[in-house]
A protein has these predicted regions:
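Charged DNA-binding/catalytic regions of mobile-element recombinases
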Residues: 1-200
């Protein structure tokens, strides 16, 4: 299967389940022109199959540059690992103007939204069932699974973490994107300074 690049056929569990008592925020990027880093961040959870068992992966991405700012693995679907990823991204890269999620209970929970509200970040949420509203990170998941997860069938959590970490580093640092003139996500997020001549 690995050599033939065959994708296993199975029904992935849903990673987004709405909580009936949690507040749902409107989708803010609908008519927004995104022109700079830290204007909009997004996050999502995906299912990571292993040879025996599975894990859940959450990532925080800068929408403009496509750079993965942080990520976490967990064997449960609680909000804790999502909050850890959010706090890490904010500690390393500051705060976005808008933070977009789906309507999953992890992201609508009071603990998660409190982190954003305390930082005065505007909260945005996809329309129900509208994966296209968070298409940037959905494309990331597709590439990660096709190029890393399905080709390796990791045995353990540590192997999975190492493999995903290597892939994300390569994605951030080496993969060019046509939308940014073939710059990598890291280059688009942190444009190189123009060399200026210093007057004598």
């Amino acid at each position: 299967m690995k050599l033939m690049r065959l994708v296993p056929i199975y029904q992935e569990p849903k990673t987004s389940k709405k909580h009936p008592e949690h507040k749902i925020h409107p989708y803010l990027p609908k008519d927004l022109v995104i022109t700079r880093p830290n204007q909009v961040w997004c996050t999502d959870i995906t299912y990571i199959p292993m040879r025996r068992g599975f894990l859940y992966l959450v990532a925080v991405m800068d929408w403009y540059s496509r750079k993965v700012l942080s990520w976490r693995l967990s064997n449960t679907m609680d909000a804790g690992f999502c909050i850890e990823a959010l706090k890490e991204a904010m500690a390393k890269f500051g705060t976005p103007e808008i933070f977009n999620t789906d309507q999953g209970s992890q992201f609508t929970s009071a603990d998660f939204t409190a982190v954003l509200l305390d930082a005065k970040v505007k909260i945005s949420m996809d329309g129900r069932g509208r994966w296209i509203d968070n298409r940037m990170i959905e494309r990331l998941w597709r590439s990660l699974k096709d190029e890393c997860i399905y080709l390796n069938a990791f045995e353990t959590r540590s192997e999975t973490r190492k493999g995903i970490g290597a892939w994300i580093t390569c994605y951030n640092e080496k993969r060019p994107h046509s939308s940014h003139g073939l710059m990598t996500p890291t280059e688009a997020y942190e444009p190189p300074r123009t060399n200026l001549k210093i007057a004598a």
